[in-house]
């Protein structure tokens, strides 16, 4: 019998209880797994079911406990997607110290800044995300729509994106960009 055989059996019982609704029996089993290394997996699964009411402080606390495991970033992504879907922008921003790495979440990040009053930073982020040689994630569409309605890209930014599209051999994007360009730039885009 190895050191963890009893805990392994309890862990399997805890997983079964989680699947069936995580009642009092689950809490008792989980408490018995205080030193079991995979207990954090149980906490992760439980937290996924609590995302709607989870506060930024609770999310940060779990991520601190799960630091060094993939579960910290997995909870962060799930939390951010959930808060973005619910448009709970202050809660979204409450777990971030910097813009996220994933483009989808960056788009939500700048939407959150826009919704909480930081229009300048939001539109700066929109311009940066827009200036690529390919179509961006659909999550960016609401941000781009607000940016376009407010100021949108100038011809220099349109030209920059067109050159990136040209390098990526994305003629469809170049044709799309023409609708935003001034008359002189439209002629230049025809030459690409």
Describe each region flagged by the PLM.
Residues 1-192:
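Extracytoplasmic and endomembrane cell-envelope/extracellular-matrix remodeling and assembly machinery
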């Amino acid at each position: 019998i190895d050191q963890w055989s009893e805990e392994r059996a309890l862990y399997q019982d805890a997983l079964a209880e989680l699947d069936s609704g995580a009642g009092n029996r689950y809490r008792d089993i989980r408490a018995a797994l205080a030193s079991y290394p995979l207990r954090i997996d149980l906490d992760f699964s439980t937290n996924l079911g609590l995302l709607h009411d989870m506060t930024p402080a609770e999310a940060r606390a779990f991520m601190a406990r799960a630091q060094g495991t993939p579960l910290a970033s997995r909870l962060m992504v799930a939390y951010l997607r959930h808060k973005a879907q619910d448009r709970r922008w202050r809660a979204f921003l409450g777990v971030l110290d910097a813009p996220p790495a994933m483009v989808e979440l960056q788009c939500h990040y700048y939407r959150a800044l826009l919704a909480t009053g930081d229009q300048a930073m939001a539109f700066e982020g929109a311009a940066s995300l827009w200036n690529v040689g390919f179509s961006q994630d659909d999550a960016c569409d609401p941000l781009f729509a607000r940016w376009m309605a407010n100021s949108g890209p100038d011809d220099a930014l349109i030209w920059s994106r067109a050159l990136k599209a040209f390098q990526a051999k994305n003629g469809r994007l170049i044709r799309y960009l023409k609708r935003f360009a001034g008359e002189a730039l439209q002629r230049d885009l025809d030459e690409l």
